[in-house]
Amino acid sequence: MKSMLEKINQLRDVLKHHEYLYHVNDAPEITDAEYDALLEKLREWESQYPELMNPDSPTQKVGASPSTAFKPVTHQVPMLSLDNVFDEKGFLAFNKRVSERLEAESSAQKASLNPLVRDSDQKNRSEKNVQEALTFCCELKLDGLAVSLIYEKGELTQAATRGNGFQGENITHNIRTIQSIPLRLKGKALPQRIEIRGEVYMPQAGFEKLNKQARANHEKIFSNPRNAAAGSLRQLDPHITAQRPLNFFCYGVGLLEGGVLPQSHIQRLMQLKAWGLPVHDRITLCTGAEQVMAFYQEIAQARATLGFDIDGIVIKVDDVLLQEKLGFLAKAPRWATAFKFPAQEKTTQVLGVEFQVGRTGALTPVARLEPVELGGALVSNANLHNADEIARLGLRIGDTVVVRRAGDVIPQIVNVIIESRPQNTVEIIFPHHCPICKSVAKRIEGEAVIRCTGGLFCPAQRKEALKHFVARRALDIEGLGDKIIHQLVDKKYVQNPADLFHLTSEKLLSLKRMREKSAQNLLNSLKKSQKTTFARFLYALGIREVGETTAANLALYFGQLDLLRKADIETLKKVPDVGEVVAKNLVDFFGNEHHQQVISALESVLDWPDPEPIEKPNHPFRDKTVVLTGSLNAFTRDDLKAHLISLGAKVSGSVSKKTDFLIAGENPGSKAQKAEKSGIKIMNEPELIEFLKALKPEGTKV
């Protein structure tokens, strides 16, 4: 029994990890189908061993804890999630459970009716056979973010995420920017207070446009519309949310005070629509299992034409009084379920494999497929990741494979249909030389990827390196998008980043779609970017594993480029956040002859101030380890981090014995508790501001 307990607890931990990634970080590592399979396995084990049930199990919970970036909101009526069914058999089992429970209840004394949902027909309601009365309201299951909207006397006063079902995040300012959500309800007989529940989502066209803009600006690309919607709602600046193409459909009511609603769920939705709230027009009343299955098939076929992502339908008992009789389980209502679509899969043939070269030289195999329509999109390639993945699949060129749109977005090969393998398949062999520059390609010990060793000599790496070099957090060169970079490299106008600063108006005007004004603006941006900082310069070089914080630490520690490029591994490891791997990457980068030439060329065109000497007695943060937590008002986290580093501090992401200070913003969370227990000095934001002011000469700004 002990081994079974260990298995169950291990699976619970895995599910909790993925719940956190999905609900809090908006960065899932597995598909919805894979998560559902894990949860189903846990349910099966807990059913077999009920004595091992734990109230904290993922089967008993709704979602992950709310982020600390927004103020918490407690839901007066819990926002529970739904149980899932995945096929007709599962739906019929749900239908049977509902019918049997209502039949068992019908002989008992009627439960007292909620006066808030009475209407004039309620008292005259005749006795009906349970099966005849059982009508379902069927809706689309949007793949977005569930939200709660509170209207008081018709005015929108609060909006919150679902969070863990009992406590969410206050996102009122961001919700007010969504055009489809009315700030005031229209009509008469509005309730004193009503909670509207619905889904915020991003239409597919808006998602594609958002990612296109992000690529042009060298910003983060969202993996799917759901993540884009969630990330947009969690922006601290509502102006950013206002620029995102978000939409909303409501699907129900939570809290109701001082008002009357119909006893039919679909009639309630029609009432909400009359008040000005958006309700999707494909909601349908279905009597009996046959009609529900017909609706399911209809929506499955229409799915690709909707213009937004759905992953199934939602089936709800329409009669609100019957909903009350059926009640709730720990995490979901008994009267509703989500009938999820299977992951979109089709078979096709692998025509070949090409190898793409990334910024750091990683050779990524991409399968070229016989084009196949999948979820409304024509899929003609799939990322194979690395040699280990190819070996796991046992994949060969010419194989027939099952392709799935993971999370309904990213094409991936699920498995090879071995019985369909022809005799003339070809083994996939990783090249020994880069397919672009012909430099040696080799696999580094301990890594799964094979890399081109050509560095910036490689045109493919050069293009990606240039995109990184001009990005906002690097040299911040406005107007230099991906298409322009590709043309500059292809025309051999730019061989390395230093060549950017020798571009002329004539060369720029020879590029496609380049006009005189755009060319001059780009030249102005290039000139402006020549004045930078040592830290930005180091980050812009694109050295593997050297992010903004590490670049800032290196700049602070060495102060001068000459000292940095002469440093050995042991010296580099003395820098905060630099370990063996990063130190070796730095030594290899600065030891590369081509890189040395590029850096020398950049030194001749860029200018950054020498670091100001930091006197220990005047700067209490010097050589101190500082941790930031909670949401800040006077600073952005990046700006404060950079300022602390400039004062000589080492900024860390976690509290440990080495931590000297904890800077706590609003809703600081567990880091503050740990720091307090460890006796670490904690400063709130006002205290920090006063502390920093005391370090500055009079009249200067923090």
Swiss-Prot record:
Name of the protein described by the UniProt record: DNA ligase
GO cellular component: cytosol
Binding site for NAD(+): D32, A33, E34, Y35, D36, S81, L82, E139, R162, E199, K316, K340
Binding site for Zn(2+): C434, C437, C452, C458
Cross-referenced InterPro entries: BRCT_dom (IPR001357), BRCT_dom_sf (IPR036420), DisA/LigA_HHH (IPR041663), DNA_ligase (IPR001679), DNA_ligase_AS (IPR018239), DNA_ligase_CS (IPR033136), DNAligase_adenylation (IPR013839), DNAligase_N (IPR013840)
This protein's record includes keyword DNA repair: yes
Names of the cofactor(s): Mg(2+); Mn(2+)
The species this protein was found in: Hamiltonella defensa subsp. Acyrthosiphon pisum (strain 5AT)
Keyword Zinc recorded: yes
